[in-house]
């Protein structure tokens, strides 16, 4: 734009002609020198015509849709009246040369570039610029026809307006108060308040509502001819019309044409009554805002998960990290001035109009909202990687979005009476959930917070919880049983050396000392979100002819694919692209071209290219396109010079690369360089071990390094393996860290690894691991190891540590059972698996039963109780051995259904599921007492039950006999010679009822197996009693047997009418096998 004149970096004096069919840019010519200013109008016009004919066609703005031909011909043919007025205005318009102002922009503003909007320019200011006193903005609806016709009706003596200065009247600025500081360079910061003159502005507003709105906000003189007018009238000055206005067909297209074609009138605007949401047009500037008070999302990965989003299109809002407060915040006193957000708004105002600027509490982040998306894009490109708030802490700028908050209607009486809503609805409305730990569960609970009247959004009163630790997996929600963070390298150095010596392998002591010393002195970046410097973007430098844009890159890629370029041409191309090499490496087309150049260039050219981009290898390696170039560079590096250049550019950022999705492949590629080039990788792992292994990608990258046993040295393998064993309790309880424990147990080939690991787990950590859901899986994995002597020894060491020892509250078994989270479940898994031998299992069940009956353990695991033969209800604490052992409560849903043996018991004892004997009685409820039997005498799944009926009844001590031996003998008699067991009938309990007569009426109704006959058995040993056998089925056979020890005794005591019955029925379960 050599021949185009700019007015103080503004295109306000460049009129436009917008026609439905064509769009034509109109420019005004530059004044070549100062002598031409004094020539007459005719000479100026002749010289301008010559200049236009000799110059090339002007560069067109990107927003115009069509090309314009010859400007003069097109303008004359389409709009003759406008062309005449334009030439008339050039004849009578003197050019005013204004020297540059003394105010200069600061260094930061001089290096940044404004967005490409219709009111801004990219041309750098010159020492002598043509400055106009017009308003710096104009609306797009101000067409050329409307502007010229409006200017032709004005005289030069009304105010200070001339025909050349048609946008404003004078240079008097608005002096309305602003809550912020003075921003001389913020040309679009307070546009509605500062760009309109108070008295002599002849440009009509676009809508009448804006005039009324501004007058109601403390500026009554906008667009008003009278300074003391406080009404909502649109007052225009009285002007002299020298000639009639020319009509144009283009005026009919626009809605504002009647305002410019008709005489201005004084009329009152009828505005519907409404209450504006905000009475201030200035941007919202807030410091130390609670992140939960606004509903916002961003693509930055440093924010809490509730505010993260994987992909976000460009928006008008950006999030800036590493924004620290400029002044200390007092706990009991609010800051009088928002210094941080105000300075941030000042900085961002040069890229466009700022609507709001907020700094978030506890996150060191800020949200800046612009009026347009283009302003946000420009600010993101300019501020990316800059040290905005603190030296050494570059800021990461990402797109963000502030979503509307759901606000419930306020309650006059208070906020506690708000109606309850479902949890999912509250989550959608507010987006904040607090997790409260209750034993083993983390139940989500919504924080009900009142609405704040200080901010327009919904705020929260007591935000005390940082949501950055919020995880999605159930294992991650479980807290760590050990104090965090784990011991550092300096604290665990002795343990590492002791573990290395336990392997009893030979290694290089000098290499080990060198590795540990460098790891202790490691000064690499520990921030996993900082990836080093970024290459300069193309938009920040002046555009040159040799810039490689997308069409050129696409053409080069076609030439590479067709092998049409020679080696010399490729090397020449590499030298030409040298300045843009880091930037093109991250381009979706440029990265393929750079890879081809590294593949086909000589070592000298590769060295030159590496020296240019080695400091950007980290930022390239974490980019989805640049990582391919970075891996290609590592693959093609084959000389010591090239290897040194690659390692020097990556060594300081090893930890961020480990934890990145694409950067971890860069580390694995450098690993092949071997010792000593890859030593910095293991030094970084030792120095930042817990930071790396907690990450999803970091733990897998460490495992990949350990599996490359052909590349790494014996010392490096021993050091990392020893550190894994030392921190194994922490790794076993972490979702990503447990991958290294699995590698150690399954893949590692070091001797005695299992025994060394068991010593570390058993020593003071076994109880916490067994009671942790994820940690117990590691213990079970060790117990299920199959192999040689080492695996057996490690398994026995854990089993003896758990089940050996005294039966007391200090034992490991008691502590595991007493833990209400996951400890009983772990014991149940150990008992039901094939880990234990039969003898060890029986001893373990006996010990568990004794602990449960003789201690205060409130065991809630029904499966474990059934596995050891106890009931899941009715176990009272501190039961002595004199009390009888209880069995399952016989409460059934239907009379014909009975509860049977548990599934685990059936599976472990190879028995068939039978129904338990049913009890139906019309008399008092029977009380169940159980006599415990030793494990050696009776199977734990068969229970000797004793039914005693309550009432005015006395137990007959003489009639009781030991039925256990008889039951055992009967079980033995039910075997056939070949060892096959028979299915026995299931006998129901008798229905015992007492009547007014002094005799016992016992009705026996039995239900036989479907394959056997129905038989009722009445057993009586006392011949002095009256026995009445009433059966519902008269066809049943009644057999009187004296085999069982069931005695019905009628004893006469002092109460003549009392009937004392002692029914000592020995109940048992029968072993039942399939037919």
Swiss-Prot record:
Pumilio repeats lie at residues 574-611, 612-647, 649-683, 684-719, 722-758, 760-800. The modification Phosphoserine is found at residues 72, 198, 872, 876. SMART domains: Pumilio (SM00025), RRM (SM00360). Residues 38-68, 93-112, 874-931, 997-1075 are annotated as: Disordered. SUPFAM superfamilies: ARM repeat, RNA-binding domain, RBD. Residues 511-872 form the PUM-HD domain. Residues 93-105, 901-916, 997-1009, 1018-1063 have a biased composition (Low complexity). GO terms for molecular function: mRNA 3'-UTR AU-rich region binding; mRNA binding. GO terms for cellular component: cytoplasm; P-body. Residues 316-402 form the RRM domain. The keyword Transmembrane does not apply. One of its GO terms (biological process) is nuclear-transcribed mRNA catabolic process, deadenylation-dependent decay. It is found in: Cytoplasm. PROSITE patterns: PUM (PS50302), PUM_HD (PS50303), RRM (PS50102). Keywords: Cytoplasm, Phosphoprotein, Repeat, RNA-binding. It comes from the Eukaryota. The keyword Ligase does not apply. Present with 377 molecules/cell in log phase SD medium. RNA-binding protein involved in post-transcriptional regulation. Negatively regulates expression of COX17 by binding to the 3'-UTR of COX17 mRNA. Promotes decay of COX17 mRNA by enhancing its rate of deadenylation and subsequent turnover. Predominantly binds to mRNAs encoding membrane-associated proteins with roles in transmembrane transport and vesicular trafficking. This is mRNA-binding protein PUF2. The gene is PUF2.
